[in-house]
């Protein structure tokens, strides 16, 4: 699969193409172009270091949305064994935006709940662009309760722009479905580990994100609102999305500082889409470590720590009181 660069990656892409052309020319015509190629390789390394070492929040959002980025099922193929997908919420339908099922991870049987996007128009229509309906969240809850019944930990892979806001979704009470998941996950009597692997959009992400450990990939984001929507509300113009992204503190690095997430999972240089296997290996290692930490806890302690974890979220500051005379 040929790499499709983002706008800010164009200088890297152009250098890589030039380097490839030189190598092909050297091989084809048996010409020694090693000095030129070494110079170009040095320039490429420096360009990569400069661009990827200084990514803005908005650039990380673009990487998180990259159409070639590995999705949940790509990680399931690489990190899990004996995957069996289960379907339906037993009320209305099966939501293909949220594949959920049973799998083996690190020799242990577990429940896996996910969001899934598509790579082309046909797949995106089937997956609803990763935007789940109420039946998706109810299916996820059905499987989590199954995991609780049989003592299986829950692993959640989050990658959604947000829950689907269509008329049918509202008629079937999407807000209620998410709210019930928040309540039930808080008291689920088995360990829960969540990982934001791409987009973590608002309540749609949080609906399967109440966990004992929350991981996030290096270039993923987790936010109450998309930068474009925030820009449209605050500036009445979507063109301020980059400024909104900075203000929202939605990057993995900001979220870790704010203690919203517990661990940042490293990605290869350029993003997860540049190397699926190494990203999957990093995620698998992080998930295994997180599960080891929480699986050894007694149930009562597990639930108390989960409750306190979410009670501690958020910071506030107080402004100085200004008297009426001072205002005058």
Model-assigned labels for residue ranges:
Residues 158-288, 292, 296:
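Conserved catalytic cores of soluble enzyme domains
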Residues 61-64, 125-129, 270-273:
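Short hinge/gating elements
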Residues 33-36, 136-137, 230:
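Short, motif-level signal for alpha-helix interfacial/capping segments enriched in acidic residues
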Residues 53, 92-94, 100, 105-157, ...:
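Glycine-rich beta-alpha loop segments
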Residues 70-72, 120-122, 164-166:
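Short active-site-adjacent helix-start/loop capping segments
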Residues 1-109, 277-328:
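Intrinsically disordered, low-complexity segments enriched in small/flexible residues
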Residues 15, 56, 112, 159, ...:
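Terminal peptide-recognition signature
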């Amino acid at each position: 699969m040929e790499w499709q660069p983002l706008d800010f990656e164009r200088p890297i892409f152009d250098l890589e193409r030039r380097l490839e052309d030189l190598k092909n020319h050297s091989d084809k015509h048996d010409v020694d172009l090693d000095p030129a190629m070494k110079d170009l390789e040095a320039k490429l390394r420096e360009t990569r270091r400069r661009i990827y070492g200084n990514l803005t929040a908005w650039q990380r959002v673009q990487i998180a949305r990259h159409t070639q980025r590995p999705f949940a099922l790509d990680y399931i193929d690489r990190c899990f064994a004996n995957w069996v997908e289960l379907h339906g919420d037993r009320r209305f339908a099966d939501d293909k935006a949220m594949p959920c099922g049973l799998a083996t991870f690190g020799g242990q049987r577990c429940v896996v709940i996910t969001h899934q996007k598509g790579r082309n128009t046909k797949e995106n229509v089937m997956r609803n662009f990763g935007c789940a309906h109420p039946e998706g969240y109810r299916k996820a809850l059905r499987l989590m309760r199954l995991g609780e019944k049989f003592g299986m930990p829950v692993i959640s892979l989050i990658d959604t722009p947000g829950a689907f806001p269509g008329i049918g979704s509202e008629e079937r009470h999407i807000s209620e479905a998410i709210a019930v998941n928040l309540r039930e996950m808080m008291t689920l009597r088995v360990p829960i580990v969540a990982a934001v692997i791409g987009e973590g959009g608002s309540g749609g992400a949080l609906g399967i994100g109440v966990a004992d450990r929350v991981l996030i990939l290096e270039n993923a984001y987790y936010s109450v609102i998309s930068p474009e929507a925030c820009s449209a509300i605050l500036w009445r113009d979507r063109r301020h999305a980059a400024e909104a992204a900075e203000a929202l503190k939605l990057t993995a690095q900001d979220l870790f500082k704010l203690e919203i997430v517990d661990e940042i999972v490293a990605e290869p240089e350029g993003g997860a889409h540049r190397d699926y296997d190494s990203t999957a290996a990093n995620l698998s290692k992080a998930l295994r470590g997180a599960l080891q930490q929480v699986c050894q806890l007694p149930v009562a302690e597990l639930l108390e720590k989960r409750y306190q974890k979410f009670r501690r979220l958020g910071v506030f500051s107080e402004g100085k009181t200004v008297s009426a005379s001072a205002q005058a």
